[in-house]
């Protein structure tokens, strides 16, 4: 072929399952452990987003065996002009080997680019104004803690040029 058209949009994998309420056999991030973990004390560096935000959560090994836990941060953007999945993985971190009863605080960082989506009509990466929900868990469907922060006004994260714009129309799924 002389050309190949990529026709896969933003609703791929867990983004599709979570947004359209489809239960997969194993959700994104699913894993087994020989122990159990408890999440507590979610803290944001502020209630209003500036140029970045840190999110911390304490993870405690509540089982009888030592183990490690992967902490996943999902972000839900305001449902406004930009079509987005219900949540997207934006950061993750792994604990050290936690002994039974031991805790560790994991700190993750969100930057403006983590909030942005590309808006072709504006040739820019934009973070919409509004309330954003941070969800922390061990998989895309097993959320343990959540918190909300606000973006007071639209942020233009990066402006681009429209070079080699395609003349092929693409219809993506919509919520």
Positions of predicted regions on the chain:
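Detector for glycine-centered tight turns/loop "hinges" at secondary-structure junctions
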Residues: 63-64, 80, 123
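Short, hydrophobic/aromatic beta-strand segments
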Residues: 66-73, 85, 118-121
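Short, surface-exposed ligand- or partner-binding patches at beta-edge/loop junctions that are enriched
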Residues: 109-139
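Intrinsically disordered, low-complexity Pro/Gly/Ser/Thr-rich segments with frequent PxxP/GP/PP motifs
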Residues: 81-120
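Secreted, periplasmic, or luminal enzymes acting at the cell surface/secretory milieu
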Residues: 1-68, 74-76, 100, 128-129, ...
């Amino acid at each position: 072929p002389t050309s190949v058209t990529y026709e896969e949009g933003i609703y791929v994998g867990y983004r599709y399952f979570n947004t359209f309420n489809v239960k997969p056999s194993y959700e994104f991030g699913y894993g087994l452990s020989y122990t159990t973990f408890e999440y507590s004390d979610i803290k944001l560096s502020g209630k209003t987003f500036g140029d970045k935000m840190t999110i911390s959560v304490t993870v405690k090994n509540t089982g009888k065996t030592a183990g490690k836990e992967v902490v996943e941060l999902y972000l839900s953007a305001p449902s406004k002009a930009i079509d987005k999945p219900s949540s997207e993985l934006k950061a993750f971190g792994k604990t050290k080997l936690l002994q039974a009863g031991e805790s560790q605080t994991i700190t993750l960082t969100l930057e403006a680019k983590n909030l942005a989506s590309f808006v072709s009509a504006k040739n820019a990466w934009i973070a919409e104004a509004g309330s954003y929900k941070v969800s922390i868990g061990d998989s895309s469907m097993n959320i343990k803690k959540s918190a909300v922060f606000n973006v007071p006004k639209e942020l233009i994260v990066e402006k681009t040029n429209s070079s080699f714009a395609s003349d092929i129309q693409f219809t993506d799924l919509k919520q």
